[in-house]
Amino acid sequence: MSRVAKNPVKLPSGVEVKLVGQLLSVKGPKGTLELIIHSSVEVEIVEEAGELRFAARNGDQQTRAMAGTTRALVNNMVQGVSQGFERKLQLVGVGYKAQAKGTVLNLALGFSHPVDYELPNGITAETPSQTDILIRGIDKQLVGQVAAEIRDFRRPEPYKGKGVRYADEVVRRKEAKKK
């Protein structure tokens, strides 16, 4: 059995889990997420203990790995509908600005035109200051994907460090060429 799948997923109060066929839906105070469970993974809902248990239907390596992956995905779903996920981005550079307007994030990144990024459903963006962006949502994968797409508009360059970076990212700097 996968070492990850051995640990059950604890369900916090206010989180409901339903399994209909292969479709697992997790409902919490922040919203609802669904996942199609792979046919080689068995999911057991233990109501008394308030937890989910995962097991591989047979013992081969790929099935055990799939059980661990499914457990990790469901754990992220439970955490997402109860607490949510957030990613912080920083804009470093002269004239780099961000402004959130509803479902559109307006970015000035040193191009000749402003960049308008349409946020997908379930994702919200805040701009506490002009150079900080907070991306929030219940789907961990989608929050990370949106943050990566925004960062890709202007990645941090190694000479001056200008660009869009994650708040916890360390940009490796290079020395300028000498004559």
From Swiss-Prot:
Superkingdom in the source lineage: Bacteria
Gene from which this protein is expressed: rplF
Family to which the UniProt record says this protein belongs: Belongs to the universal ribosomal protein uL6 family.
Record SUPFAM superfamilies: Ribosomal protein L6 (SSF56053)
Gene3D superfamilies: Ribosomal protein L6, alpha-beta domain (3.90.930.12)
Subunit structure: Part of the 50S ribosomal subunit.
Protein name: Large ribosomal subunit protein uL6
Keyword terms: Ribonucleoprotein, Ribosomal protein, RNA-binding, rRNA-binding
Cellular-component GO terms for this entry: cytosolic large ribosomal subunit
HAMAP family hit by this protein: Ribosomal_uL6_B
